[in-house]
Amino acid sequence: MDTELLKGTLSLLILSLLERRAMYGYELAATVRQETDGAFQWKAGSLYPSLHKLEKDGLIRAEWQGKSEGRQRKYYQLTEAGRAALAEKTEAWASISKAVNQVLERTHERQ
C-alpha cells in the first residue's frame, strides 16, 4: 500500500481509536493492524512522534498506569479538544474521500 497515502490518516485513526477508550501505543498499533487486515502497520518511528504531537496540541493526554512493581504503560486518551478535532477531521476525510471516489468512478466508467 502507498505509504504516502497512509501518512495523512495517522492522526485521524489515532483520534478515532482513542474515542473508543484509552489505549497504550502498542495497543493502538495492534488494533489498527487487525481492523485493517494488515493494511496499516504502524511503526514506532511514526506512531510515537504522532502521539507526542497530538499530546502537545492538547488533543490527547497521557497517563502512566500499571502496578508499582510491574510494568507501567503510558495510556493515551482523547480530550474535549481532541473530540472536536476528530469531528472536523472526519468531516474533511468524508469530503476528500467522496471527491476522490467520484473521479475514480468516472475514470472507470469511461474505460
Kindly label every feature range from the protein language model:
Residues 47-54:
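Basic amphipathic alpha-helical segments that dock to polyanions
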Residues 68-90:
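Basic, amphipathic "hinge/linker" alpha-helix immediately C-terminal to the N-terminal HTH DNA-binding motif
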Residues 84-111:
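Amphipathic alpha-helical dimerization/coiled-coil segments
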